[in-house]
Amino acid sequence: MNKMGDYTSETISHIDREFIQDLIRKGERIDGRAFDEYRQIEIEANVVPAKAEGSALVRLGDTSVVAGVKVLVGEPYPDSPDEGVTMVTIEMSPIASPLFELGPPKEDAIELARVVDRGVRESETIDAKGLCIEEGKKVYMVFADVYPLEYDGNLIDASSIAVNAALLTTKFPEMKLEDKKVVATGNMLKLPVKNIAIEHTVSKIGDKLIIDPTLREEFVQDCRLTMAVDQKDNFTALQKGGGAGPMSLDLVDQAMGMALDNVRAIDELIQAAAKDVE
């Protein structure tokens, strides 16, 4: 089965494959970027206020995604009675790319959701205890849904940026338990966001590394490494995928350096987008 960023050779011609690989060997990329350079990033927050408590549209070059956040009330898990729940899902539609198919979530959609979800969970982006309404009875449940609109590579990073921007701008009604019923207090709350972690994806092509791969670059990659980096430069999650090619420890160190070089600028874009809707 094809995996995200690891499609069959029929998707790209042999000539294109050789051309891209040859450029990389020469230290060049098809769009003229440096190996450690992201495409232009644009973030627009609160794009669907009527349908979500928080939302964001992200354009990463010619890749674009929208993330929407819904906050519901539910019961906590038995092993964490005083903690709320946060979950990331994704719906990959043929509208974004003919590579995506209608129907139940495929392996690539599940993988993408897991990677982005792990970045949120492992960094403890949301203070789970701050989502508790009444211990053991009711908590807030936060669902971040991602919808790719256009796909030209690196859905992971685009989705991560969109989810973080949407979470930062989420406002929802405060609820309380009264006579065993959930009722609104009339107040509005913001999510207890305590740590932002941005995911950075680096592709290995031959013995070279490039950050933020385009779709054509994903077609020829040997593998990729996705790293979640928080605001204190901590690496909170790592995931290798996109192919079975090996990646040495030296290359992993190099990839981590690329991520650290970019995290501050992207975080500033997210924070600026969030301030625009305050």
Regions found by a protein language model. Give the residues of each.
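Polyanion-binding surfaces on beta-sheet-dominated domains and ring/shell assemblies
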Residues: 2-278
